[in-house]
């Protein structure tokens, strides 16, 4: 049956038509049998007349049932509580009333009607509950709408205040943004004047540094005039090439690197230069002047290369002064030996004859060493082969994987199975 929430009584009545027709057929069959029994009874004339009247009444009910529509039967059964005995005791009851009462009282139809009545009652109760719930919802919605109106008013006021505050903040930020622009311009102007002052401050320190470099190079310059000229020409070439490559960013980096020199080291080198008794001091001073003019145009790359050997010499000179004059006398021959080494190009430190001899001797030594090394190579090869064989033997002796071991055992068992030696049976036997 239909649920009370979705009950439609007309649809239920239409669904009951088949049931009513089936019950009507059953009731008519029963009435026909009873009419036949009443007519077949025997007795007195009064009893026979009574039976004939009953049979006639039943025939009228049968004809009324045939003309009745099933919807009328179901609606009358749902509407009123039909009592069959009361209707039959009435003397003025019609055949249709009796026919409807007979059909409604039938037990099959009565069950269906009772279920429909319960569904209708539940549907009515549900409708009442829904109405109560809707009324409560409407009341709550009214209260909620009032609250939302108040909240919307408050929210609109807050939004207006927030917009006013945001507009004020935007104006303040614009004003502040204009001020830093002027400040930044002033800072840029200061920064432009600043580097000039820095360069002016650093410029007095350059001559002293360059003098120290000249004094160092006076110790490092070779004694032979040929080597002097070679090193000088190489330096000039390197400075010209570096000028073409790095002209912009070199000067700044050089100034940063030159700031690492200390005044103490400069004074020490002045002392060393004054104490030195070399005969070529005048020439070294002249060469230092020339280099000073070249260094003004040189790039950062050459200055960085100069500083690395200079720092090493600083450390060595410090140790020399602490140990005294006796230590200085020992250091002088070592410095004289170093005079043959070039500061920038280490390839010039050796003589040309030594390089030629090395080139001539190199192929001879290679050709001589090869046959001598042959037996050693053979011995090494034999050792490697023997080691590999031992490794393979050890690997064979190691325990195998369970799957490999099982397959090996299975193969052994198959090889051990004896060949069938009995007599083959044929169909002829």
From Swiss-Prot:
Modified residues (Phosphoserine): 203, 205, 264, 279, 281, 349, 351, 367
Biased composition (Polar residues): 146-157, 373-383
UniProt-annotated stretches for the region Disordered: 131-157, 176-429
The keyword Cytoplasm belongs to this UniProt entry's keyword annotation: yes
Keyword Nucleotide-binding listed: no
Swiss-Prot/TrEMBL GO biological process terms: maturation of SSU-rRNA
One Pfam family recorded for the sequence: BUD22
Skewed-composition ranges (Acidic residues): 249-265
Tissue: Abundantly expressed in heart and skeletal muscle, and at much lower levels in brain and lung.
Recorded coiled-coil stretches: 42-67, 108-146
GO cellular component terms, A-Z: 90S preribosome; nucleus; perinuclear region of cytoplasm
Positions of crosslink type Glycyl lysine isopeptide (Lys-Gly) (interchain with G-Cter in SUMO2): 190, 316
Chain intervals with Basic and acidic residues compositional bias: 183-195, 296-341, 357-367
Subcellular location per the Swiss-Prot or TrEMBL entry: Cytoplasm, Perinuclear region
Transmembrane segments: none
Recorded superkingdom: Eukaryota
Subunit structure of this chain's protein: Interacts with SRF. Forms complexes with SRF and SRF cofactors ARID2, MYOCD and NKX2-5. Interacts with the N-terminus of SLC2A4.
Role noted for this protein: May be involved in regulating transcriptional activation of cardiac genes during the aging process. May play a role in biosynthesis and/or processing of SLC2A4 in adipose cells.
Name used for this protein in its record: Serum response factor-binding protein 1
Organism the protein comes from: Homo sapiens
Lineage: Eukaryota, Metazoa, Chordata, Craniata, Vertebrata
Name of encoding gene: SRFBP1
